[in-house]
């Protein structure tokens, strides 16, 4: 059903309007008003002639009659009617001119022309006219009180100094016609086809390429003179574009479109009914020629294929600036880094014990410290063994998950810990506990077994990221599965500097207080000794 609906939406069919729609859209108001006024003038003159014999010469001219048909008033509808009839004929001539200027072809020729429009490549062009104004003077003669007075008039004249044109080069992005198909045109005797043209972009890459070429052209020409006039449009190569086509199903046009019939009805002031009937019998088809740019970026067989767009590749720069202002600097690994973390550990030169696999246990994650101290990488599914006497309690293992597992960490400092692990009395934890063993940290950029303060990573502490029969996850899923390393370097450094400055200020204050107290004590002692020596 969905495919049928899509096919129906991508098909254009002519439709014949009803009477109400014809009256609402094409009412021909001027012709209707002129026709009604002419009819009123005709009835007014007829009434005066029948009722009062205003236009017969039998009554004497000296008799004065009162009313609308009196002498003099009876000629007003006649003169007014003649003027309206001239205006009415001019309006009919303008209406007929529109039909004459419209291109009239057979239905087969119209379909061939539309096919040529669909297959022709588009030409999106830009034109610029650079110009400036020059100040000029001229002598003019003016008359004041009958005397000719010459004066100097200052005016400005436009001077075009440079003209240039360019077009959109779409060899890299490619194009394709996505216009609708036309059906059921042969069912109607007369079909009015209204043609329009436009272009759209399949992705942001094509739109950006178009905007870059357009802005480059205008930027190169806007500095050539003071002002610049811009023109742009779209054409189709090797095919002249026609906005309206009148297609006939028969070799000859129908009777209501014949010029003799039109002028016969127009002379009888019946042009308005004929036009309404013509519009009602004519089917209307609105067809738009649409060209799609950027097809090479969507086709996997093309060398310019970029793949489906993700949110991370189309994120607006405003969102990135907002994240930077909030100091939320997430160091997120790429898809290849996530998938190659296991290979980095496996290919190192360290002697690893036998490989073991640990089942992951998902634990609620506590808050991350705001400083850089004791930051531990917490990946989705990461486990760690805790060497303590309280590790006898075994956490029940959840059912196997269908998600990719990250690295496993184990704390093995000596042979006792290894034996303890081999006995199977270990506790799986999503985050390493804070014990006597120093915590180890892992950076996303690279994994080193000889980092300062950290020990080697054993083979038995690690497990594969994905199962052998499990397909790799998408990039967005991998980002959500691998928790980012959250470090606020600015805040940690600033806090350390603040603490150092605070401690140094405290030390200086204490030293100054001690010096002041010592000086005061010495002064008191000297004062006490001086009175004893004076007597």
Swiss-Prot record:
Keyword rRNA-binding assigned: no
Pfam families attached to this UniProt entry: TMEM151
Keywords: Membrane, Transmembrane, Transmembrane helix
Residue intervals passing through the bilayer: 27-47, 73-93, 254-274
A cellular component annotation (GO) from this entry: membrane
Keyword Ribonucleoprotein among record annotations: no
Protein localization: Membrane
Disordered, as annotated region: 498-535
Low complexity bias: start-end ranges: 510-529
Topology versus the membrane: Multi-pass membrane protein
Family designation: Belongs to the TMEM151 family.
PANTHER family: TRANSMEMBRANE PROTEIN 151 HOMOLOG
The name this protein goes by in its record: Transmembrane protein 151 homolog
Source species: Caenorhabditis briggsae
Organismal lineage: Eukaryota, Metazoa, Ecdysozoa, Nematoda, Chromadorea
């Amino acid at each position: 059903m969905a495919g049928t609906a899509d096919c129906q939406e991508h098909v254009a069919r002519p439709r014949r309007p009803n009477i109400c729609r014809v009256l609402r859209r094409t009412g021909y108001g001027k012709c209707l008003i002129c026709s009604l006024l002419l009819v009123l003038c005709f009835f007014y003159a007829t009434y005066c002639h029948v009722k009062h014999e205003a236009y017969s010469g039998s009554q004497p001219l000296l008799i004065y009659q009162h009313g609308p048909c009196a002498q003099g008033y009876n000629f007003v509808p006649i003169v007014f009617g003649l003027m309206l009839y001239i205006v009415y004929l001019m309006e009919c001539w303008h209406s007929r001119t529109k039909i004459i200027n419209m291109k009239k072809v057979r239905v087969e020729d119209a379909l061939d022309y539309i096919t040529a429009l669909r297959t022709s490549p588009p030409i999106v062009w830009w034109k610029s006219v650079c110009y400036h104004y020059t100040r000029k003077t001229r002598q003019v003669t003016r008359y004041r009180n009958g005397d000719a007075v010459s004066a100097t008039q200052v005016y400005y004249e436009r001077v075009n100094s440079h003209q240039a044109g360019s077009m959109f080069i779409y060899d890299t992005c490619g194009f394709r016609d996505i216009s609708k198909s036309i059906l059921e045109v042969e069912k109607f005797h007369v079909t009015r086809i209204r043609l329009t043209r436009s272009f759209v972009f399949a992705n942001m890459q094509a739109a950006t390429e178009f905007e870059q070429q357009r802005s480059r052209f205008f930027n190169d020409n806007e500095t050539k003179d003071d002002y610049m006039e811009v023109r742009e449009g779209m054409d189709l190569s090797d095919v002249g574009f026609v906005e309206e086509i009148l297609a006939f199903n028969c070799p000859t046009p129908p009777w209501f479109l014949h010029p003799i019939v039109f002028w016969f009805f127009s002379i009888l002031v019946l042009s308005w009914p004929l036009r309404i009937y013509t519009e009602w019998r004519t089917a209307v088809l609105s067809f738009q020629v649409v060209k799609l740019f950027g097809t090479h970026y969507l086709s996997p067989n093309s060398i310019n294929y970029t793949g489906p767009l993700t949110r991370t590749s189309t994120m607006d720069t405003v969102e990135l600036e907002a994240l930077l202002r909030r100091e939320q600097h997430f160091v997120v690994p790429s898809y290849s880094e996530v998938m190659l973390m296991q290979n980095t550990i496996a290919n190192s030169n360290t002697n690893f014990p036998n490989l073991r696999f640990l089942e992951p246990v998902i634990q609620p994650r506590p808050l991350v410290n705001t400083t850089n101290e004791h930051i531990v990488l917490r990946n989705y599914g990461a486990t760690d063994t805790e060497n303590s006497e309280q590790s006898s309690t075994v956490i029940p293992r959840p059912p196997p998950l269908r998600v990719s597992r990250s690295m496993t960490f184990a704390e093995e400092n000596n042979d006792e810990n290894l034996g303890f692990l081999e006995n199977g009395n270990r506790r799986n934890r999503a985050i390493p506990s804070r014990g006597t063993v120093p915590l180890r940290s892992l950076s996303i950029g690279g994994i080193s077994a000889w980092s300062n303060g950290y020990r080697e990573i054993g083979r038995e502490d690690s497990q594969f990221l994905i199962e052998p029969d499990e397909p790799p996850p998408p990039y967005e899923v991998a980002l959500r599965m691998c928790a980012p390393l959250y470090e606020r370097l600015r805040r940690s450094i600033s806090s350390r500097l603040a603490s150092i400055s605070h401690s140094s200020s405290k030390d200086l204050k204490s030293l100054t207080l001690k010096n002041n107290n010592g000086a005061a004590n010495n002064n008191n002692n000297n004062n006490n000794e001086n009175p004893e020596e004076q007597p």
